[in-house]
A protein has these predicted regions:
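Loop-to-helix "switch" segment enriched in basic
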Residues: 205-206
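P-loop/Walker A NTP-binding region and its immediately flanking N-terminal helices
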Residues: 1-152, 160-171, 179-187, 195-202
């Protein structure tokens, strides 16, 4: 592949900002659209393979409603104190929008005690705060949290759909490529869309 290298990560530059730009999982998207149209977002739990768009979908939802947003990556902040203190401080303050949304990314990294604290926070602040959790392994999320969420499995799009998204990115970045390049990247990365785009960017040379 030949193009111009840059510091900006393509996965961020081309992260969909709306539901219309999101690929795959049409049945989930239709339900999410109803939540947004009604202006009433439940607690949500998205689970599935890494790189298939769980975090992207969570951020689209948060940005599509009248809400303040707090984002926490639970792989970095997974202790009971981090969850309880940070979220409680955020949820208990007066907001200027209808909702407060907490995205807990990689929630399966939360310790059992942290999950127990989270369950209590979900109950205490349910009038004003909605929680959107993402994880790879839903079985690591305690049942009391799962029961408080609308839970959706996020499945990877077909290889052809991922390949077309990669082609769109390369065309937008004016990168010359061979079809064999696309096939090789998809075969080594699928079903991880994020990995495919990162791999393509890493192969671009000056």
């Amino acid at each position: 592949m030949f193009g111009v290298t840059e510091n900006t990560l393509w996965v961020e530059s081309f992260r969909p900002g709306t539901l219309d730009g999101y690929i795959g999982n049409e049945h989930v998207i239709q339900k999410v659209k109803i939540f947004i149209e009604n202006g009433d977002i439940p607690h949500l739990l998205f689970y599935g393979t890494a790189g298939t768009g769980k975090t992207t979908l969570a951020k689209i939802i948060a940005n599509s409603v009248d809400a303040d947003l707090m984002y926490i990556n639970a792989s970095d902040e997974n202790s009971v104190d981090a969850v309880r203190d940070k979220i409680k401080r955020y949820a208990s303050t007066v907001g200027f929008k209808r909702w407060k949304i907490v995205i807990l990314d990689e929630a399966d990294y939360l310790t059992p005690n942290a999950q127990a604290a989270l369950r209590n926070l979900m109950e205490t602040y349910s009038r004003t705060t909605r929680f959107i959790l993402t994880c790879n392994y839903v079985e690591k999320i305690i049942d009391p949290i799962q029961s408080r969420c609308q839970t959706f499995g996020i499945t990877p799009p077909d290889k052809s759909v991922v390949a077309q998204r990669l082609v769109d990115v390369l065309n937008e970045k004016q990168v010359e490529y061979d079809v064999n390049d696309i096939v090789a990247i998809i075969n080594s990365s699928y079903p991880d869309i994020r990995r495919a785009i990162n791999s393509a960017q890493s192969h671009v040379v000056k």
